[in-house]
Amino acid sequence: MVNDLTPHFEDVQAHYDLSDDFFRLFLDPTQTYSCAHFEREDMTLEEAQIAKIDLALGKLGLQPGMTLLDIGCGWGATMRRAIAQYDVNVVGLTLSKNQAAHVQKSFDEMDTPLDRRVLLAGWEQFNEPVDRIVSIGAFEHFGHDRHADFFARAHKILPPDGVLLLHTITGLTRQQMVDHGLPLTLWLARFLKFIATEIFPGGQPPTIEMVEEQSAKTGFTLTRRQSLQPHYARTLDLWAEALQEHKSEAIAIQSEEVYERYMKYLTGCAKLFRVGYIDVNQFTLAK
C-alpha cells in the first residue's frame, strides 16, 4: 500500500490533453483510444471499436437500472454504449480535462432519464457504491505500487455479486522474453525508454501474473482472461495510417516534432504487439 494516493493528473494530462483535434485525426468517430476487436475481417475501425466495447460490457452481467463505473473513461464511448444497450446509470472517471469536458457535453446532449456523470478525478478519490466496474486502457497508468490499493478500492465499492472488467496492456518480464525466444535488442530498450519518457510518462504495464495475483489477494476470482494481441497491432496500424494521411493537419495543429513522435510511437508499438513483446488482455474479475 502507498501512503499518497493522489491521482497522477500531470502524467495523464501530458498525453491526453495534447489536443482533441489532434487525436481526431487518427482515432475513429467514437474517439476510442484503445485496442479494437476485429470480429470480422471486413470491419471498419469504428465497427471494431464498438465490438470491443460490446465485448467488455457483455462480460459484466449488466441489468437495467444498475450503476456502472468507468475508470479511465476516455471520451465516453463505453458509457454512452452502456446507456444505449443496457439502460444503466453511469459514472466516468478521467484525469484529462479535455476528456471530461467532451464527455460532459455529450451527456448534456443525450435524451435519457438515466443518471450520467463524469468526474475529473481518479479512482483514489472515488468511494461511492456501484454495481459494476469497467476499466479499459487505464490500469497501465496507475503504477505497480498502486495495484493493491486499486483492487482493494474496487472490491470495497462493489456489491457481493459485483464484477470488474479490466482491459489492460500487459508486458513480459525479462526472463519471460528470454523464455519466449524474444531478443533483448538495443532498439527495444531505446523504444521502451522513449515510450516511458515521451509518450506515456509514468506508464507501467503490468504482467499477467501481477493482475492475477494482486486481484486474488483482494478477494477477486478470475473467471476469464482474453487476449486481443493481434487486434492491437491492427488497431495501431490503422491509427498510424490515418495520422500519416493527415500529416499536414497534424503539423498545423501541433508541430512536425509531435507528428514524428506519434508516428514513431504508433508504428513501434504495432511492431511490439505483432512480435509478442507486449499483449493486451481483458480480465473478468468476480467478487
UniProtKB/Swiss-Prot annotation:
<feature type="binding site">
    <location>
        <begin position="33"/>
        <end position="34"/>
    </location>
    <ligand>
        <name>S-adenosyl-L-methionine</name>
    </ligand>
</feature>
<feature type="binding site">
    <location>
        <begin position="72"/>
        <end position="74"/>
    </location>
    <ligand>
        <name>S-adenosyl-L-methionine</name>
    </ligand>
</feature>
<protein>
    <recommendedName>
        <fullName>Cyclopropane mycolic acid synthase MmaA2</fullName>
        <ecNumber>2.1.1.79</ecNumber>
    </recommendedName>
</protein>
<comment type="pathway">
    <text>Lipid metabolism; mycolic acid biosynthesis.</text>
</comment>
<dbReference type="GO" id="GO:0071768">
    <property type="term" value="P:mycolic acid biosynthetic process"/>
</dbReference>
<dbReference type="Pfam" id="PF02353">
    <property type="entry name" value="CMAS"/>
</dbReference>
<comment type="similarity">
    <text>Belongs to the CFA/CMAS family.</text>
</comment>
<keyword id="KW-0444">Lipid biosynthesis</keyword>
<feature type="active site">
    <location>
        <position position="269"/>
    </location>
</feature>
<dbReference type="GO" id="GO:0008825">
    <property type="term" value="F:cyclopropane-fatty-acyl-phospholipid synthase activity"/>
</dbReference>
<comment type="function">
    <text>Catalyzes the conversion of a double bond to a cis cyclopropane ring at the distal position of an alpha mycolic acid via the transfer of a methylene group from S-adenosyl-L-methionine. MmaA2 also catalyzes the biosynthesis of the cis-cyclopropanated methoxymycolates. Cyclopropanated mycolic acids are key factors participating in cell envelope permeability, host immunomodulation and persistence.</text>
</comment>
<feature type="binding site">
    <location>
        <begin position="123"/>
        <end position="124"/>
    </location>
    <ligand>
        <name>S-adenosyl-L-methionine</name>
    </ligand>
</feature>
<dbReference type="GO" id="GO:0032259">
    <property type="term" value="P:methylation"/>
</dbReference>
<keyword id="KW-0489">Methyltransferase</keyword>
<dbReference type="InterPro" id="IPR047672">
    <property type="entry name" value="CMAS_actinobact"/>
</dbReference>
<feature type="binding site">
    <location>
        <position position="136"/>
    </location>
    <ligand>
        <name>S-adenosyl-L-methionine</name>
    </ligand>
</feature>
<keyword id="KW-0443">Lipid metabolism</keyword>
<dbReference type="InterPro" id="IPR029063">
    <property type="entry name" value="SAM-dependent_MTases_sf"/>
</dbReference>
<feature type="binding site">
    <location>
        <begin position="94"/>
        <end position="99"/>
    </location>
    <ligand>
        <name>S-adenosyl-L-methionine</name>
    </ligand>
</feature>
<keyword id="KW-0808">Transferase</keyword>
<dbReference type="InterPro" id="IPR050723">
    <property type="entry name" value="CFA/CMAS"/>
</dbReference>
<dbReference type="GO" id="GO:0008168">
    <property type="term" value="F:methyltransferase activity"/>
</dbReference>
<dbReference type="InterPro" id="IPR003333">
    <property type="entry name" value="CMAS"/>
</dbReference>
<keyword id="KW-0949">S-adenosyl-L-methionine</keyword>
